[in-house]
């Protein structure tokens, strides 16, 4: 399938990405788990004219149902995960739209074309002195893209050697 636009309109959720954060206290267990699933704008378009915190009970129930579906699917890989959840937070494309001002809540920024990757490659440096960019639309999109472009932006400020020295592992 075309992985760049792949989405199955299945109920319940049929695909997730599970990310477990490395514990800072040396514990072999994580305290934080992120679960991500694709969601097209059409799923939340009915609330597009609303604001954060003012979307009503139907929207809250929709988010709760999607969170429950994600956790249930994650439990096929992490048994009893739901029983271990102390707090949970969910977002939709509306959340991304309202907090990041991305069109229709895009979480991945400018669409990249693997046939011609240089066409959408942006650099951190701008023509405006001391104005630098970072984020999902510069080089790589998504969660990893934001992390990588932050390093590119830091390299513009500190120099590549300084960033390499900071990120180098023994």
Regions found by a protein language model. Name each.
Residues 42-49:
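Short acidic/His/Gly/Ser-rich catalytic and metal-binding motifs that mark active-site loops
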Residues 1-28:
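Mid-domain catalytic core of redox enzymes
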């Amino acid at each position: 399938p075309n992985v760049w636009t792949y989405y199955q309109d299945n109920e319940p959720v049929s695909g997730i990405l599970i990310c477990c954060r490395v514990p800072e206290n040396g514990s072999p267990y994580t305290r934080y788990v992120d679960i991500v699933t694709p969601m097209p704008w059409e799923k939340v378009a009915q609330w597009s004219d609303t604001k954060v915190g003012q979307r009503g009970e139907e929207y809250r129930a929709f988010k709760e149902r999607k969170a429950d579906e994600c956790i249930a699917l994650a439990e096929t890989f992490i048994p009893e995960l739901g029983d271990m959840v102390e707090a949970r937070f969910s977002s939709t494309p509306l959340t991304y739209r309202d907090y990041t001002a991305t069109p229709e809540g895009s979480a991945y920024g400018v669409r990249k074309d693997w046939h011609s990757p240089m066409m959408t490659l942006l650099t951190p440096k701008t023509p405006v002195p001391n104005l630098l960019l970072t984020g999902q639309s510069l080089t790589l999109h998504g969660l990893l893209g934001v992390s990588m472009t932050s390093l590119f932006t830091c390299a513009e400020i500190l120099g590549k050697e300084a960033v390499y020295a900071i990120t180098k592992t023994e």
